């Protein structure tokens, strides 16, 4: 039986070039995302530990952005095709194939973790495990920025994403899961992307307790 990780990896490996071309400059039209990522980078630098992981890095464009913002950033992704593309596009940066629930990082090693829409394909019942893993690799006071599709519903909503099945989350519910994992949410941003998806673009910033 094919699990959701295998399905997601295969699906993204099949759209590497298309995905990279669509998202390479996407943040130029997303000022809210740029602001949250910039704030995240500033706060990570302030911890004195600039080492940061871009989990679910895809073609590596946000890893490069974090590097430009002064972080010692590296990228991790489930899809080997995405990692190959990222290495070719950004040869000076480090990229490695990895699963988000089993990161190849020592305990308390990072000042920051960026998860930019990279947890959206995880079934709700498995998300606590993923969040606990992000908490494990963060040093005390380290930062996690999670970006996701938000919903006004009370529970996560499954929908047919163009690449693989995905879930939108109520921000309050996801904040509770972050807190349960030892990650204290202290800032959030939700906005309407003026699209026909029917979801909010949502961002939660949390600090490792």
Regions found by a protein language model. Name each.
Residues 1-47, 152:
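Conserved class I S-adenosyl-L-methionine
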Residues 51-102:
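Class I SAM-dependent methyltransferase SAM/SAH-binding core
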Residues 101-113:
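A short acidic, Gly/Pro-enriched loop at the edge of an enzyme's catalytic core
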Residues 128-140:
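A short glycine-rich, Lys/Arg-flanked "PGG" loop and its adjoining helix->strand segment in the class I
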Residues 157-173:
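Acceptor-substrate binding/catalytic loop of class I
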């Amino acid at each position: 039986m094919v699990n959701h990780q295998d399905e997601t990896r295969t699906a993204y490996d099949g759209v590497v070039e298309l995905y990279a071309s669509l998202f390479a400059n996407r943040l130029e039209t997303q000022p809210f995302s740029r602001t949250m990522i910039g704030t995240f980078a500033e706060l990570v630098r302030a911890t004195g530990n600039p080492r940061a992981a871009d989990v679910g890095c895809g073609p590596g464009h946000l890893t490069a952005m974090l590097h430009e913002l002064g972080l010692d950033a590296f990228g991790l992704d489930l899809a080997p095709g995405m990692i190959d593309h990222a290495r070719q596009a950004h040869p000076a940066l480090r990229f490695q194939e990895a699963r988000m629930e089993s990161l190849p990082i020592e305990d308390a090693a990072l000042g920051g973790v960026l998860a930019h829409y990279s947890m959206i394909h995880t079934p709700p019942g498995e998300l606590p495990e993923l969040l606990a893993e992000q908490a494990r690799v963060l040093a005390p006071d380290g930062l996690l920025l999670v970006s996701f599709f938000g919903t006004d519903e009370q529970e996560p909503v499954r929908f047919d994403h163009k690449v693989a099945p995905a879930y939108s989350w109520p921000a309050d519910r996801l904040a509770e899961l972050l807190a349960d994992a030892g990650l204290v949410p202290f800032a959030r941003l939700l906005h309407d992307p003026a699209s026909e998806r029917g979801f909010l673009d949502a961002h939660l910033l949390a600090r490792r307790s």
